A protein has these predicted regions:
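Catalytic cores of DNA base-excision repair glycosylases
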Residues: 2-8, 12, 16-140
Length: 140
């Protein structure tokens, strides 16, 4: 077990390392749960470099839950083309339709986890990044 001074030192070193080595990614510049959710779904089984090319274009076309929920499937899939795994886009639209009916994005890990196509990793990422909830984002 680490002592409190050791924990503080480790924390300080990790934050220093991150400040030097972090990547400037567009989805790290927002706390909007919708935008973070879109990025996390796009990043499932897809390289970061590929997602960067699609993320902002996708959000320009579907800037909010309502626009994604109401989009014709052909339009959605055309904007997803190139990312592969089209079931992700279809699940995203189903989730957007559910959220649109409720009127707000779920603000808890459990609520996010219940959305179609959302697993533990994505739910933890959205909960921790968008809502500052203490959920570890563990890839496995």
């Amino acid at each position: 077990m680490l002592s409190e001074p050791e924990i503080q030192l480790l924390r300080s070193r990790l934050l220093h390392w991150f400040s030097i080595n972090k990547r400037d990614l567009p989805w790290r510049r927002t706390s909007d749960p919708y935008a973070i959710w879109i990025s996390e779904v796009m990043l499932q089984q897809t390289r970061v470099a590929a997602v960067i090319r699609y993320y902002e274009r996708f959000l320009a076309r579907f800037p909010d839950i309502g626009s994604l929920a109401q989009a014709p499937e052909a339009d959605l899939l055309a904007h997803w083309a190139g990312l592969g795994y089209y079931y992700r886009a279809r699940n995203m639209q189903k989730a957007a339709q559910q959220v649109n009916q409720v009127g707000r994005f779920p603000a808890s890990y459990e609520g996010i986890r219940e959305l179609p196509g959302i697993g533990d990793y994505t739910a933890a990422a959205v909960a921790s990044i968008a809502f500052d909830l203490p959920h570890a984002v563990v890839d496995g």
